[in-house]
Amino acid sequence: MASDGARKQFWKRSNSKVPGSIQHVYGAQHPPFDPLLHGTLLKAAPKAPATPVKAKRISTFQEFESNTSDAWDAGEDDDGLLAMAAESLNTDVVMETAHRVLRNHSQRQERRKPQEAPGPEQEPQPSAEPPSVPSGDLRLVKSVSESHTSCPADSAGDTAPLQRSQSLPHSVAAAVGGTSDPSALSSSALSEREASRLDKFKQLLAGPNTDLEELRKLSWSGIPKPVRPMTWKLLSGYLPANVDRRPATLQRKQKEYFAFIEHYYDSRNDDVHQDTYRQIHIDIPRMSPEALILQPKVTEDNYTFAQPGIQMKVKMLEELVSRIDEQVHRHLDQHEVRYLQFAFRWMNNLLMREVPLHCTIRLWDTYQSEPDGFSHFHLYVCAAFLVRWRKEILEERDFQELLLFLQNLPTAHWGNEDISLLLAEAYRLKFAFADAPNHYKK
Amino acid sequence: MEAIWLYQFRLIVIGDSTVGKSCLIRRFTEGRFAQVSDPTVGVDFFSRLVEIEPGKRIKLQIWDTAGQERFRSITRAYYRNSVGGLLLFDITNRRSFQNVHEWLEETKVHVQPYQIVFVLVGHKCDLDTQRQVTRHEAEKLAAAYGMKYIETSARDAINVEKAFTDLTRDIYELVKRGDITIQEGWEGVKSGFVPNVVHSSEEVVKSERRCLC
């Protein structure tokens, strides 16, 4: 070991490669990864906080936007039937459409069965796992590299791991993303409808004043890729409905953003901010770069200590499910599975951890079109999501298998079609199980 | 079909954010290591059987807790029903070691009237060049709290089996001696399946050869 003096100090040595060690990060700007901008900011920031490279920023922001637009690519929009309904989003039409989508889907499922290799969802067995691994089976697992040093008595046949199914479906999703449903409506009809939807969006967005109500209705059933960036900005209130005011507003907001950076960036190494900065520093590499999307507004309750907001929402979900599907509810209760054990993450991460990223994006098209989409409607989506697995849930008769299933739902291959179905069902539930009618403004 | 096991132990894995709790558990239960791991939200659940002696299997149910402070109110609900725990720190992160004491205090408050058998785990021992905590001082701290100390690496699969299996054996001994007893309303230890309940012929044959003490 090192000498006393050295030992006292050795951990203070610079550890530039330690995960989570405090390092200078120059990526806290928008757009990131622009060496020119880095240089300018670095030099300019301490002395001349006000004005460097304005024009540059805008052009590189646009560059950034187009460079990263493929993050929105995965999966084509979307379901034609819902699209038509959205044109006049009144209850009857949507309800009728929801039913039609569900009906249509079950027919497609029927048609699809013979020609398709059984995916995990279609399998008759209640398995959350890849087909190669038998379900419901507890197995002895040996870490590959350690197996010769321990557990000498393992029998050879017992080595298949008890797998969690894809807990991070993003990579898989990226691989399968963009493949459209082969059994969807005839492609020409579909693309025709898509083209006309896209036209409607473009007309609306062109102004001079975008009708936000109309835009919401249109967006409910999914926003076509090319217009999604602008549509999200309008729906989230980031940019104004008036077309002429948009460039100036965008410029102002970006300026504000850079002002925040200049204001707070240097404070990151202050003692009081060490823990926060450390956590951020650790979390950023863990986020998929594709996941850098607009954050919804969330109440403070949700992300403060003890997260009372999130816990309350889990309780609300429980209450809702008990009314929607008493059998599932009782089954979970009987096996001592608590909603907090699986649904906490659903609420905390808005299902982002449960479905592939392109599904989350599609989901958020609708969340931004629904009144209180991210809070209230999300509850119904979660309820629909849980009940979606009722068959599998009811077949599991053991706490452990239930919880493993619910924490690792087999959604890795989900596409927009699945999300559309989920949303249609959620919408139906919202009307059928309304707890208070005034939730449904218009 | 369930395999036969003598006991079921519930374990909890705690420690600062990013010390490698989830990666350690994944290595143990799935036999693999992911370079990038999402932060745990709330509590994740894992399970695995271990064989502590030929024919003697223990079913482990493992609660993987989020290290981040804001999830504490969720995670602390799981102390009470745990019989064993792995308390992790990251040997390349001094602060995570300094927080070991706080973690023990935190559990002490919430586990009563039960107790958790803890092992102190110095994780990421493959990163020895970036070490900020010596083995000696970690052993000293562990001894002061009556814990064993072990250094592990999920990346290189060092001591991962041993950390879990040793803890399991220690708990098993305590159960056998009657120092830990199965109690109504406590999930820490449950007794296993009685062989004749199991219908799989293969399992029954296996168990008949064995002495279930």
Curated annotation (Swiss-Prot), chain B:
Ways its activity is controlled: Regulated by guanine nucleotide exchange factors (GEFs) including C9orf72-SMCR8 complex, which promote the exchange of bound GDP for free GTP. Regulated by GTPase activating proteins (GAPs) which increase the GTP hydrolysis activity. Inhibited by GDP dissociation inhibitors (GDIs).
GO molecular function: G protein activity; GTP binding; GTPase activity; myosin V binding
Cellular component, GO annotation: cytoplasmic vesicle membrane; Golgi apparatus; neuron projection; plasma membrane
Residues given in the record as Mg(2+) binding sites: S22, T40, D64
Superkingdom, natural source: Eukaryota
InterPro entries: P-loop_NTPase, Rab39, Rab_GTPases_membrane_traffic, Small_GTP-bd, Small_GTPase
Pfam families: Ras
Lipidation (S-geranylgeranyl cysteine): C211, C213
Cofactor entry: Mg(2+)
Record's bilayer topology term: Lipid-anchor
Keywords from the named record: Autophagy, Cell membrane, Cytoplasmic vesicle, Golgi apparatus, GTP-binding, Hydrolase, Lipoprotein, Lysosome, Magnesium, Membrane, Metal-binding, Methylation, Nucleotide-binding, Phosphoprotein, Prenylation, Protein transport, Transport
CDD domains associated with the record: Rab39 (cd04111)
Region (Switch-II) residue spans: 67-83
Record EC number: 3.6.5.2
One of the protein's GO biological processes: Rab protein signal transduction
Role according to the record: The small GTPases Rab are key regulators of intracellular membrane trafficking, from the formation of transport vesicles to their fusion with membranes. Rabs cycle between an inactive GDP-bound form and an active GTP-bound form that is able to recruit to membranes different sets of downstream effectors directly responsible for vesicle formation, movement, tethering and fusion. RAB39B is involved in autophagy and may function in autophagosome formation.
Family label: Belongs to the small GTPase superfamily. Rab family.
Protein name: Ras-related protein Rab-39B
Source species: Bos taurus (Bovine)
